[in-house]
């Protein structure tokens, strides 16, 4: 049992697991911000543009069940905004990575064979 706890601790304290945990927490907070933006700013503006339509109240009944498709539309808008924000983040991140790779590729690689030939020639001269 003690060995399993040690293995779990080692697993949990690895950088990738901690990074993932932080990302999940930040993602949840970001989701709340986006939901608030959609619910309180974007959808009311869309409603005004569509003649005062309030999406939160859009629903219909099927028997005793209420189908709230307005809330579903808001969830779709949430998803689109979050997906777009992630897309932009990944696009910016990959552009930084590409720039870094380009600078690494642009640095000239020293011609090791030339250096070795020069060293060989210098050693030959010293032996004479």
From Swiss-Prot:
The chain crosses the membrane at residues 11-31, 70-90. It is a multi-pass membrane protein. Pfam families: MscL (PF01741). Keywords: Cell membrane, Ion channel, Ion transport, Membrane, Transmembrane, Transmembrane helix, Transport. SUPFAM superfamilies: Gated mechanosensitive channel. Channel that opens in response to stretch forces in the membrane lipid bilayer. May participate in the regulation of osmotic pressure changes within the cell. NCBIfam families: mscL, PRK00567.1-4, PRK13953.1. This is Large-conductance mechanosensitive channel. The gene is mscL.
